[in-house]
Amino acid sequence: MIKPSQDENITPKAFTLGALVITRGVDAFLDGNYGALFPMINRHINCDWGDCSKEDAISNNWATHRGERIISSYELQGEKIWIITEWDRSVTTILFPYEY
């Protein structure tokens, strides 16, 4: 959610992913085809938040400055996939929304 003081035109800044992990559900779904994740990971690290609302995108942009959690959403083979980078940038998890 956008806070009243947040400028909608904030430019996101580079951030680190930390350890990159996937859930068991995503692992089973991919069946070894981990390369299918690379385009989404690339979009996430380049601040393209995917299929999220404008408000969530602005919050993510601010999160890159404030050290808050970053959540992006993409579609892979008809399934929604989330990528979440934790506030301290220690880990980035790739998961299905129902695994949250």
What is the predicted role of each segment?
Residues 5-71:
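Compact soluble domain cores
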Residues 63-100:
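Short, compact, well-ordered microdomains
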